[in-house]
């Protein structure tokens, strides 16, 4: 195995020693892992090239029963530039080439006919042109305080992830009153698709706070073209 980590020391110490020896003998530059990771997007194609060379070696040499490989280029470039951009199309083409090379390796190894290929992603992308900042509204209502980019005091806060946000109310004594107030205010924000209370969490596959203490007190969903930001800076909620 080779772990999916940046740090060179961990990358090598947690890898199978005999595999590292084989890769070095083949001239695959595993010593570049951390250097290329630190380069950000500029190092993504190099990393995918190296990971594919490693996969080819494992397939042709060891004929594994199962092999998983993480290609990073498409995710990184679409995060940086959005969908339907020249960079995104280039990244998709690059990853297509890497998948083709892996398939060709199974043919070379004589296991193609008995191999199932699964190409999957952990998430998709939606292009947005506006950001909703629920923590700005919470700050304006006196429910949190910030110092520069940092939130330093909070009675409530929003944890955001793309087109969704989870609002946690930490003021237990006034939780119901605050939840009702925030529900009404969040509904009025342009770009807000839904403000969901715990009684309706089943509709989005979310456990209630009673079922899981890590669950939020309100769940927010953005309309197409909008994304959530966790920033509490500024005066504009959108």
Language-model region placement:
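Short secondary-structure boundary/capping segments
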Residues: 2-4, 83-86, 132-138, 234-237
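Active-site neighborhoods of enzymes that stabilize oxyanions during catalysis
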Residues: 152-238
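Structural recognition of the beta-strand scaffold that forms the well-ordered cores
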Residues: 66-70, 117-119, 166-168, 219-221
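Extracellular/periplasmic catalytic domains that process cell-envelope and extracellular macromolecules
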Residues: 59-63, 110-113, 158-161, 211-214
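Extracytoplasmic/secreted cell-surface and envelope-processing proteins
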Residues: 77-79, 127-130, 176-178, 229-231
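Metal-dependent active-site segment of extracytoplasmic phospho-/sulfohydrolases and closely related
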Residues: 94-138
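Active-site-proximal segments of metal-dependent phosphoesterases and phosphodiesterases across multiple
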Residues: 81-96
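His/Asp/Glu-rich, glycine-adjacent segments
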Residues: 1-82, 187, 194, 229
């Amino acid at each position: 195995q080779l772990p999916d980590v940046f740090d060179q020391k961990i990358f090598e110490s947690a890898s199978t020693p005999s595999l590292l020896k084989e890769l070095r003998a083949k001239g695959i530059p595993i010593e570049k892992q951390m250097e290329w990771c630190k380069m950000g997007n500029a190092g993504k194609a190099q990393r995918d090239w190296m990971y594919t060379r490693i996969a080819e070696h494992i397939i042709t040499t060891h004929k594994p029963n199962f092999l998983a490989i993480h290609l990073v280029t498409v995710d990184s470039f679409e995060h940086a530039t959005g969908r339907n951009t020249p960079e995104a199309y280039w990244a998709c083409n690059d990853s297509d080439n890497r998948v083709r090379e892996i398939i060709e390796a199974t043919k070379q190894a004589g296991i193609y006919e008995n191999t199932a290929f699964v190409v999957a992603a952990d998430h998709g992308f939606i292009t947005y042109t506006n950001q909703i900042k629920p923590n700005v509204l919470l700050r304006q209502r006196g429910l949190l305080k910030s110092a520069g980019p940092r939130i330093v005091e909070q009675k409530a806060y929003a944890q955001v992830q793309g087109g969704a946000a989870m609002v946690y109310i930490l003021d237990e004594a006034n939780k119901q009153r605050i939840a009702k107030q925030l529900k009404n205010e969040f509904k009025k924000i342009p770009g807000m698709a839904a403000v969901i209370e715990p009684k309706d969490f089943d509709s989005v596959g979310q456990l209630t706070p009673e079922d899981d203490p890590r669950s939020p007190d309100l769940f927010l969903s953005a309309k197409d073209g909008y994304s959530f930001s966790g920033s509490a800076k500024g005066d504009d909620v959108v």
